[in-house]
Structure formats: C-alpha cells, structure tokens
C-alpha cells in the first residue's frame, strides 16, 4: 500500500467518523450545553448587573461633585438652596440615566474641624436612617456632602451576595468634603 493511498484512506475514515457524529441525534450536545450554559449565563448577567451598579456609582459621584461646587462657591447659599433644591440639582446632573428621586438621600453637614469630626451612622439594622440634614454653611466653613442612592439589584443571587441593605438594594455613596470659598457677599470667618 502506497503512502498516497494510506493518506487517502485516513481522510476518508475521518470524513465517515465526522458524518456519523453529525448524524448522531441523541442529544448529548444539548445536555452538555445545558451544563455549561447555566453557569455561563449566571456569570454573564451577574457581571452586567455589577457593571451597571459601578457605572451608576460613578455617575452619582460626578453628579455630587458638580452639585457640591454650587455649595463651595456660595451659589447654593445665594440661591437659597434647601435639601430639595440640592437633591434636584444632583438629579439634574444625573439626567440621561434612569434614576428615581425617591431612592436618593442627601446629607449636607457643616463641621467645625477635620480632626474633631465623628461621622454619623446613616445605616442601622440594614436600612437607611432619617438622620440626614442640610446645612451648607457659610464662607470658610468645612462641609461634607453625601448622596446615598439605593440601587435596585435585579437578580436574587446579587441581592443576597452584593446588596448592602435588607431590602436587597445596593447602597451607592458619593461624598465630597471641602472648605467653602470666601463668598464675595459675606465676610470670611476668622481663622477660616
């Protein structure tokens, strides 16, 4: 038997084997796909959900930084901002992203010094507290701005493993700490 005929016979055997495998309709491929597909899709949807929450967190951070600039420069003081107006400004800065005003909590606090500040607890027993306030301070004051957004987790797997609150929501937090600028229409406090 020559080399050429041996190669030809080998090719023909492979073709016959491939044809037999392609005709096999016993369902092993579907079963194997089922074993692999379930973990694959769980992982895929989990990554998408975590990615969306991280994206929303970054949008919240940028929105808070932009809105906090109004406090730092005195524009919020001049326009008579309260908690609702500041919250509306944060939501406006998040426009184009599906957020709910009911899920956003704002806490703006004036503090005396960086060294003597003790943070207040905004989460107790797996839920947000109502200890939030709004005090944007005066020129030269140190201000802490916090925005807390209850991001809904869709899948039950993410609710049990990635959620911060008992409701199954992931708490997104954006914080800005700064000293107010000397507003042109007020005098700066001594030592400020």
Regions inferred by a protein language model and the residue ranges of each:
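Alpha-helical assembly-interface signal, strongest on the long, hydrophobic N-terminal helix that forms
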Residues: 2-92
């Amino acid at each position: 038997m020559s080399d050429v005929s041996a190669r030809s016979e080998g090719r023909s055997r492979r073709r016959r084997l491939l044809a037999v495998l392609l005709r096999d309709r016993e369902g092993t491929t579907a079963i194997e796909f089922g074993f692999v597909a379930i973990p694959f899709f769980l992982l895929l949807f989990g990554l998408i959900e975590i990615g969306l929450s991280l994206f929303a967190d970054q949008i919240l951070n940028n929105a808070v930084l932009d809105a906090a600039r109004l406090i730092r420069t005195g524009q919020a003081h001049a326009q008579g901002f309260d908690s609702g107006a500041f919250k509306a400004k944060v939501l406006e800065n998040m426009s184009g992203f599906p957020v709910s005003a009911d899920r956003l909590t704002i806490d703006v606090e004036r503090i005396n010094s960086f060294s003597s500040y003790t943070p207040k607890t905004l989460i107790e027993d797996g839920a947000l507290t109502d200890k939030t306030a709004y005090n944007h301070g005066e020129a030269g004051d140190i201000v802490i701005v916090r925005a807390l957004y209850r991001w809904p987790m869709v899948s039950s797997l993410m609710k049990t493993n990635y959620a911060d609150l008992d409701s199954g929501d992931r708490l997104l937090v954006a914080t800005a700490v700064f000293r107010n600028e000397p507003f042109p229409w007020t005098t700066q406090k001594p030592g400020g």
